[in-house]
Amino acid sequence: MVDAAVLAKLEEGYAKLAASDSKSLLKKYLTKEVFDNLKNKVTPTFKSTLLDVIQSGLENHDSGVGIYAPDAEAYTVFADLFDPIIEDYHGGFKKTDKHPASNFGDVSTFGNVDPTNEYVISTRVRCGRSMQGYPFNPCLTEAQYKEMESKVSSTLSGLEGELKGKFYPLTGMEKAVQQQLIDDHFLFKEGDRFLQAANACRFWPSGRGIYHNDAKTFLVWCNEEDHLRIISMQQGGDLGQIYKRLVTAVNEIEKRVPFSHDDRLGFLTFCPTNLGTTIRASVHIKVPKLASNKAKLEEVAAKYNLQVRGTRGEHTEAEGGVYDISNKRRMGLTEFEAVKEMYDGITELIKLEKSL
């Protein structure tokens, strides 16, 4: 049963959202009918309610999406809301569709997107993973956070070769270490208001940590937005090298930590925008000519399913004509195909910038 106080909060939040001019996918798909159908449902294991799913979007009317999954079962229990949002965001991934089996393809296919080193400042490929047997952020206890951190820390300490490095827990971190990680742009902060409203930041900084290799080209975030964010990056445009490093790491970690996977949705994550491959392949790129013609930039981006963000990521501006550009689609295609969309799109953008 859903608590009366929760229901009251839902009704009030829904009324405000319905009356707002919010452009979020939540507002678009949370019709009165869907709302009434879901407001009394709870997930079987962790007893998550519709409020847990939508409260970030209820509080932040400027959300792009506005919903999160408090636990894996939420994707099924609240499917009437998740499915249309997933379909809208992931370019027509319908509720009858099934995400393909994981396939990283031939890692030697990709070369350098910018061999002359004129446009691409840095390249990064990341994926998200959830550990089997644990819910997502809002349902985790402090003990679970700590237990997960120790599992992750011991798993990563077994990595060798290029991936060998050190794990830094956020709890009790020395000031000098903290400053170094900030300078390297590695340190994640307590979540923004979108994550705060989704209850993704409880017991902070318990159970949170950062691992990086000695060369600072491989990074793992433990219990930021997802249980694990696995990141490979470096200066320049050598996507091939960066992708290969990521794939090696994911395969190594998966041998030791079982990941949550769903036959239909692929790898499960806290935010529905990251489902499926969970892959986000991005570049920081200077395209001053295209930057002065934003419409053209957006047009090419749309054609190749690319997402254009400001220099410092979501909800930021482009500084000095530098954009963060990545693949937008993560579902209904393989990991290899997701990275290839970005590779082809960036290649095209550079060609266009040169011709202007």
From Swiss-Prot:
Positions contributing to substrate binding = 64-68, 225, 271, 314
Q: Which GO terms describe its biological process?
A: phosphocreatine biosynthetic process; phosphorylation
Q: Which domain of life is it from?
A: Eukaryota
> What InterPro entries does its record include?
ATP-guanido_PTrfase (IPR000749), ATP-guanido_PTrfase_AS (IPR022415), ATP-guanido_PTrfase_cat (IPR022414), ATP-guanido_PTrfase_N (IPR022413), ATP-guanido_PTrfase_N_sf (IPR036802), Gln_synth/guanido_kin_cat_dom (IPR014746)
State the Pfam families in the record: ATP-gua_Ptrans (PF00217), ATP-gua_PtransN (PF02807)
Q: Give the EC number.
A: 2.7.3.3
Q: Does the keyword Nucleotide-binding apply?
A: yes
Where is each Phosphagen kinase C-terminal domain found? 119-356
Q: Tell me what reaction this enzyme catalyses.
A: L-arginine + ATP = N(omega)-phospho-L-arginine + ADP + H(+)
Q: Does the keyword Metal-binding apply?
A: no
Matching entries from Gene3D superfamilies are given as: ATP:guanido phosphotransferase, N-terminal domain, Glutamine synthetase/guanido kinase, catalytic domain
Name under which the protein is recorded: Arginine kinase 1
What is the species of this protein?
Drosophila melanogaster (Fruit fly)
